[in-house]
Amino acid sequence: MSSLRFPYPHRYDTRVVNSAWRHLDLGGRVCVLKLRRRRLRCPGHGVLAESVPFARPGSGFTRDFEDLAVWLASKCDKKTVSTFCRVAWRTVGAMCSRVVAEKLDPDRLAGLVDIGVDEISWRKHHKYLTLVSDHDTGKIVWGAPGKKAATLDGFFTTALPEDGAKKIEAVSMDLGPAFAKSVRAHAPQAVICFDPFHVVKLATDALDDVRRQVWQSARKLSDKQIAKTYKGARWALLKNPESLTDTQKATLAQLKREGGALVRAYELKESLRAVFVGDLDTDTITNMLGKWCSWAQRCRILRFVKVGRTIKKHLDGIQAAVERGLANGRHEGLNNKVRLIIRRAYGFHNAEHALAMIMLVCGPVTLELPYHT
């Protein structure tokens, strides 16, 4: 008992609490540490059992066991972790929350200058998380459930240190109004940059909508082979030409021979992507975007007419992103990691555990295996 810490110096009574903690297995056998803890009185928290140095408060596992399980959870799927550690996946989720709360860099929000904001779906039925990343470090530094302006308001009002919002110079985001509204309210000096990735995504989504419309029209015809071709052409149209397989190249060539609105939509998408692919100066990109918007207005494809109007409306923010070299491409790379985490975990039961795992893998958290220290 002499090795125990005493954060609460006043003993409450002579009763003890019989406690047990799961430790790292010994020779393939489950190892459990048992200890009788004194009850102490804290003026702020009431009667509590004394803390121990080898386990986190409220945990039934030792620090070494939790660190091992959480490290595995950042690398493996949940079934592997559950089987190897012989614990439930929900238990691993709680471990991740405790470890992240302890090891997350406390200075991650200090001195933020250029940030990226984006939302990602963590569960079906419109369950979203808003994630904020630091463009300088490439790490996710904050997250919260939801994707509205009020969600990002919490970042500025409660998460950032005092005057932290005043130091932010630029924020990259998608073209939706919610995040821009929050930034204008809390960091009016910051330049709003509409990420080129999301600009191209507008055209990509529009192209897929046109493909669906053509497919639905073809289904009504007697020749079902035509409908099958359109249905299977999704990735041939959406992927970059240099990434196509031989089969997809053949499908795309067939569509080009047939012509029509779908091919025009594909050419519009590719021409917009080409604007941001090369290392062009701002004036050239602005000129190319203006010509593209004019083309979109004349194309007689309703979805692309709308895309052209949207780009024209947000042209200042797109120019700002190009001038500052800010794009959510790195943030989208983080989002791809997040999507992999969600797939690997087969979903999460609550947003807290989802955020903990995201911060564990993509945030400023340093993890070490217990026997490597």
Identify what each model region corresponds to:
Residues 34, 57, 61, 73, ...:
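Catalytic cores of large soluble enzymes that bind and process phosphate-bearing ligands
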Residues 11-12, 149-152, 202:
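A short local loop/turn or secondary-structure capping micro-motif enriched for an aromatic residue
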Residues 3-8, 12-126, 166, 181, ...:
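Short, positively charged, Gly/Tyr-enriched micro-motifs
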Residues 36-37, 84-95, 136, 175-177, ...:
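Core catalytic machinery and nucleic-acid-binding channels of phosphodiester-processing enzymes
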Residues 19-31, 41-43, 97-169, 184, ...:
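Basic, low-complexity intrinsically disordered segments
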Residues 124-126, 134-137, 145, 158-189, ...:
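Acidic/histidine-rich catalytic cores and adjacent linkers
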